[in-house]
Amino acid sequence: MTGAESLVVEVEASRRILGDGFAGAVRFGELLAEHGEERGLIGPREVPRLWLRHIVNSAAVARWLPDAGSVADVGTGAGLPGVVLALMRPDLDVHLVEPMERRVAWLSELRDELDLDNVTLHQVQAQELHGKLKVQAVTARAVAPLGKLARWTLPLLSRRGVLLAQKGARAQAELDEAAVDLRDFAVDTASVHDVDLLGDGETTRVVEVRLR
């Protein structure tokens, strides 16, 4: 397969994965590639692999999102995965939770640029929303060890709500280590899923913690 053919396959696969959010995700990627490094959102080495590693990869949790309702993306940073999910699912109310002012300023500009009417910004730590916000799902990508993340996020979930955490190679080990923390909550199931978005054997691990 030539380089051009490979690119076509990659684009078509991305379009299939992102669905109606594809065009907005392309624009998001352009903005992040142009401004992300100077604004301290991504490192210089991330720019060449931004599209697949960060933008498309954000869709790994999409299949477990609720059919309706609201989602909170905790520690969203540059908007990953929250902005991508908001683009893919305009029917959901997406709450982007980020304590750093400069990142929230970026997210506010992004919301306007991408016409994300379904996005609400919260410049707080997740713990500050306990008792104030209830959602059907929480997403998190490279935020904290699972035990700590569970204590921050599970109080935000409504009944039968789900935490979807994108993790690395230690996903199962983190889940095992978090057993003590999870006992304090009404957890129904907790499992690790290997997600191969592009069908190329490269997997992303998603930890799913669902409440009763």
UniProtKB/Swiss-Prot annotation:
Supply the alphabetized keyword list.
Cytoplasm, Methyltransferase, rRNA processing, S-adenosyl-L-methionine, Transferase
What InterPro entries does the database record attribute to this sequence?
rRNA_ssu_MeTfrase_G (IPR003682), SAM-dependent_MTases_sf (IPR029063)
Localization (cell) = Cytoplasm
Q: Name one GO cellular component term.
A: cytosol
Q: Name one GO molecular function term.
A: rRNA (guanine-N7-)-methyltransferase activity
Q: What's one Pfam family here? A: GidB
Tell me which residues bind S-adenosyl-L-methionine: G75, L80, A126, Q127, R141
What Enzyme Commission number(s) does the record list for this chain? 2.1.1.-
Where the protein is mainly located, per its record? cytoplasm
Q: Which family does it belong to?
A: Belongs to the methyltransferase superfamily. RNA methyltransferase RsmG family.
What's the stated role of this polypeptide? Specifically methylates the N7 position of guanine in position 518 of 16S rRNA.
**What protein name does the entry list?**
Ribosomal RNA small subunit methyltransferase G
Give the originating organism: Beutenbergia cavernae (strain ATCC BAA-8 / DSM 12333 / CCUG 43141 / JCM 11478 / NBRC 16432 / NCIMB 13614 / HKI 0122)
Question: Which classification does the entry list for the species?
Answer: Bacteria, Bacillati, Actinomycetota, Actinomycetes, Micrococcales
